[in-house]
Amino acid sequence: MTKITNTFEKLLTMTQEALLSKLPEYLSERSYSVIATDYYILGVSPSEDIQPCLVAHLDTINTHRGAGSYNYATKKWGTGRKATPKAEDLMISNKYITLSPEANPKLACLGADDRCGVKTILDVIEAGKRPHVLFTTDEEIGCVGSNRIITEDDLQALSDSSMLIQIDRGVHEGFWNEMVFYEYDENSIPEILTELEKYYTLAEGSYTDVAVLGPGYDKPIVNLSAAYENEHTRNEFINLEAYKKNTEGLLSFLTWLEGQDTANWKYTEKAPVWSYYGNTASTWEGSDYANYDDNTYREFVKEDLMCVYSGDTDEAMDIIENCKGFKSWLAVSNKSYMLYKEGTVLDSLKQLVTELGMEYKPA
């Protein structure tokens, strides 16, 4: 069996299925106890000390679609051939990794989201740290792996962990070191925020695995920069200098974490605030991606997004792919609500807010 090689070239050219097959052996050889399913791989730390759990997802947009395969008439992804990058598709310099201009036209993206997160976790392990580690599947289509964990499985290592740290943040607000807490109140345990701010810049975000797992396991969460930009597009690239700096920051934070009393650390949700932006609505004030999320859940996706994005089909598809998860977040919350029905977004949002017992406040 070919073993995992912890290089970007190797990780970017592997399928989700290949990683699911190879990673358990990698972890076992480093003294981890491993639980491997079709939905996730959990590596339980060999350390007897309380550990955080590092999280990354194994799929990329290439896992789910080839470039240009969304059918607006059926509102489904096409069944055309998908592609995974090969070594010759990559352009690697001392500073950046991106797709070559001659790369396979079937490729939808580089796949840095979230192979950068996978590599970061492997780098942390190679540096001698032994946190719990969780690799999930199909995050890009609604956090399938993490939803499975919440609804079907009970993972003791997550219950025993000090906090959940995902490495899956791109550049959304102009910084290569962004961190996002989602609906977790970052001020509830101020020492976490104070320490992380030494290495990362606070930003807003929409959704990823830890946004599902944190409330489910009552653990503090954060999603840290993975040093990629333009995810979900063929212009996606990795900033190697930022990657190195962010990994060093994570290692420093993990060292600090080892000396903390984390026994009483819990998940505390932010007070809900709903704002209205034209024809969209958001719980995440100030985030463009939040507005994109809600645009996605309009009844007539094609008309709305084509209007907003001036006929840029590729950008509209990228937004759809980026934002599928919000619907799943509602399901995880045991609410069967949608942000749209046959009427307008605003009407449905009013109903949602009312039924959740919150006050609707137009901005």
Model regions: which residues?
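Short secondary-structure junctions
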Residues: 28-36, 197-202, 360-362
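Zn-dependent metallopeptidase/amidohydrolase metal-coordination segment
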Residues: 201-246
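A non-catalytic alpha/beta surface segment that caps or lines the substrate-entry region
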Residues: 2-53
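His/Asp/Glu-rich mid-to-C-terminal helical/loop segments that flank catalytic regions of hydrolases
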Residues: 230-295, 305, 351-359
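An extended, acidic, His-containing surface patch that forms the Zn2+-binding/catalytic region
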Residues: 177-217, 363
